[in-house]
Design a protein with these regions (language model features):
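Positively charged n-region of N-terminal signal peptides that target proteins for export
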Residues: 1-11
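Short, surface-exposed loop and linker segments with low hydrophobicity and enrichment for Pro/Ser/Thr
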Residues: 6, 21-25
Length: 304
C-alpha cells in the first residue's frame, strides 16, 4: 500500500509541476525606414522577433498624393506642402492608392493585400531565410523583393534592442501600428504596439517632422520630395535625428533628457502593462517629455 501511495504521489507531483509551467518568450521589436518601392515614397517596416524568428510584421509606405482624394497624415494641414498635395499613408489610403495602381498599371491586387501577403510569408522565418527572396506566393507587387529585404533589415534592427520577457501563450499576439499627433501640430507620431489579450508586451514610438536639411538626415528619398515642400525643409525621423533634435530641445526649451531616452522610458513603462491600466496615465517616472500622456495614449490606441 505504501509503495502504491508513493508511486501515486510521485505521478501527481510530476503532473502538478508540468501543469504549473508557463510558456516564456523573449521578444524584441525593431523598426527601419527604407525605399522599397522607387523614389516617390519611403517605407516603414516594423518587426517583432523571438530569438532569430520573426513573430509579426507590419509594412507601410508614405507618399505625397492629391489632398482632395486622400486622407493626410495627422497634422498634414499644418505642414508647408505644395497646394493640392499632402503626405499620406498608403495603408490608410488603400482603396484610393490601389485604384490608381489598377488604372495606371493594371494591378490586380490592393496594396494592403500585397503587404499582408508579404508579412504573412515572413512570419516564422529568420532574416537569413529572407536574404535574396524575390517572390512571394500570393503577392503581385512589383517590388516584393524590396519589401522582403526591408523586413530582414527590421529583424536585424530588432535583434539589437533590449528583449522583454512575456510569460504565457503569444498565439493571440498582434502587432499594430497607428498614426497620431501626440506632440503639438508640427509633427506626426508613428506608434507600434505588440499586444497579447489586453497586455502591451512591446511598444515603439517615433515622430516625423520637417526640419533643416543642412543639419538633419531626411527620410529615404527625401531629396526627391523637394517639389512637394514649400519652405526648404525636409521630412525627418526624430529618432534618426535624436542628437540634433535633442540639442534643439535643450537650447530652446531647457530640456534635460534626450528625446529617444524619453520615448524609451515611456515604452519601458508601458511594456508589460494592461491596456486598461494605461488609460489616463499622464506621467512616467524618469521621463520629462511634456507630452508623455499623449505618447501613452498612442500606445494604448495601437494596442487596441
Amino acid at each position: 500500500m505504501k509503495k502504491l501511495l508513493s508511486g501515486f504521489l510521485a505521478i501527481m507531483l510530476a503532473f502538478t509541476l508540468t501543469g504549473c509551467g508557463k510558456e516564456t518568450h523573449e521578444l524584441q521589436i525593431g523598426q527601419v525606414l527604407g525605399a522599397a518601392h522607387g523614389t516617390k515614397c519611403f517605407t516603414v517596416t516594423t518587426v517583432v522577433l523571438e530569438g532569430e524568428t520573426i513573430v509579426d510584421v507590419v509594412i507601410d509606405e508614405f507618399q505625397y498624393m492629391d489632398s482632395t482624394t486622400t486622407t493626410g497624415v495627422p497634422n498634414s494641414e499644418n505642414f508647408k506642402t505644395t497646394e493640392g498635395y499632402h503626405l499620406v499613408s498608403k495603408v490608410v489610403n488603400n482603396e484610393t492608392y490601389s485604384a490608381n495602381m489598377a488604372s495606371k498599371g493594371g494591378a490586380t491586387m490592393e496594396i494592403a493585400a500585397g503587404y499582408k501577403a508579404i508579412e504573412d510569408f515572413c512570419i516564422g522565418k529568420t532574416a537569413a531565410d529572407l536574404e535574396g527572396v524575390d517572390a512571394v506566393s500570393g503577392a503581385t507587387l512589383v517590388d516584393t523583393a524590396g519589401y522582403v529585404a526591408e523586413v530582414a533589415k527590421a529583424a536585424k534592427a530588432a535583434a539589437e534592442t533590449e528583449a522583454v520577457t512575456y510569460e504565457g501563450s503569444i498565439e493571440a499576439g498582434a502587432l499594430k501600428v497607428v498614426l497620431g499627433a501626440a506632440h503639438g501640430t508640427k509633427c506626426f507620431t508613428l506608434t507600434a504596439a505588440y499586444a497579447v489579450e489586453g497586455t502591451v508586451v512591446l511598444s515603439y514610438i517615433d515622430e516625423f517632422q520637417y526640419m533643416d536639411p543642412t543639419t538633419t538626415v531626411g527620410v529615404p528619398n527625401a531629396e526627391n520630395f523637394a517639389s512637394y515642400v514649400t519652405d526648404g525643409t525636409h521630412l525627418v525621423s526624430k529618432r534618426v535625428n535624436n542628437e540634433t533634435y535633442s540639442n534643439n530641445m535643450a537650447t530652446k526649451g531647457g530640456a534635460t533628457m534626450k528625446l529617444a531616452d524619453g520615448y524609451n522610458a515611456i515604452q519601458n513603462f508601458c511594456n508589460g502593462s494592461a491596456v486598461a491600466d494605461l488609460e489616463g496615465v499622464d506621467a512616467v517616472s524618469g521621463c520629462t517629455l511634456v507630452d508623455t500622456a499623449g505618447y501613452i495614449a498612442e500606445i494604448v490606441k495601437a494596442a487596441k
